[in-house]
């Protein structure tokens, strides 16, 4: 910090200090807030918004106490697409119960989840009324949506002919080194689930190194919402009740993903 002096007409010396960098104070405040509060702080001022917009924000000013990974749920029915997250415990027992948090919802039922979240973002496929498809990147925490560039006419015609095309959502970190995946050693294990679970659940992902989380793909308003933890070491399935604020009715299509960490940066 530079120290400057100025002499007034009364020969009294007054000390003047250069203004302390405001962005450092802003970053200090933001670093103590939870992820969702940081997202809301983008509306405080242009300065605060520009801080969070920085590509290197998470590295320059990491959150002091980042929230642990959560389970991300999307629930879709005729009323829209709902985005929830819930705690992600390890080694739960039969007495464990979770409460899901609703973050936001979208109207309509023309959005399709194409792949697991990457960098806190989801890739959705939007089917338009003219039978064309548009890929949309969504932030489940902040509620932001970003439509990717439209396809050209010949590409749209190709999609109409080959409806089984698959979109893959990837993330390219800036100035990061990636390891060669071919050098990893893989092993194959076969586990047999109890018959009552075989055709009723799908995998959401792995928690830790030995627990797979399952959920029901389709559920109804009157059904009890639950997830199942399958311990690979003990071969035991633990059913965990999940309390979901129901803002919808009828049959719903569910997607779930483990190890979700939200991101507050603008897209």
Curated annotation (Swiss-Prot):
Lineage top rank: taxon: Eukaryota
A Pfam family it matches: F-box
InterPro entries: F-box-like_dom_sf, F-box_dom
SUPFAM superfamilies in the cross-refs: F-box domain
Span of domain F-box: 15-63
UniProt-recorded name of the protein: Putative F-box protein At1g61060
